[in-house]
Amino acid sequence: MRANEHILVAGSGIAGLGAALAFGGGTRRITILDRDPPPPAGSAEEAFYSWERRGATQLRHSHAFLGRLTTLIRERYPDLMAELLHEGTRLFGFADGLNGTLAQSYVPSKSDEDLKLLFSRRTTLELILRRYAARQPGVTFINDAGVRGLIARREGGKLFVDGLKVERNGVV
């Protein structure tokens, strides 16, 4: 990828928000399209009860980021990790899951830090990720916009995606 590119991300779920953060960094314009309305302006608690996301069928379930993603957030986005923890997500380390007998003989290892899980309600994880992404340079959200297909071309045996077909207010 080159600087000054414009990247379209279809969906503002956890994967789409993660992609926007990975592709961003201030050198590219990132537009995140989502068929659902934006989250409420209030707290993560309010979002749990009022945010409607047709595109996220497991919205009100608990979710966990496994060790690798938790480590990536901790190392690359420490401010995001601090916000996630401040808003109620919890870290669960290897030692936290040991029963009494194993816990007594357990000797921590430096690499145990990379085994921690980050867990919370999905609404909390998405809300904080989204607010963090929205503050990054060049990131824009377009809500109530359903992606209906790709605008693509072939050149020299290669496929190039030039855009997306988007539906808004019943018009593609």
Show the residue positions of the predicted features.
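Short beta-strand to alpha-helix junction loop
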Residues: A64-F65, D112-R131, I142
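Flavin (FAD/FMN) cofactor-binding and adjacent substrate-gating region
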Residues: E83-T124, A152-G157
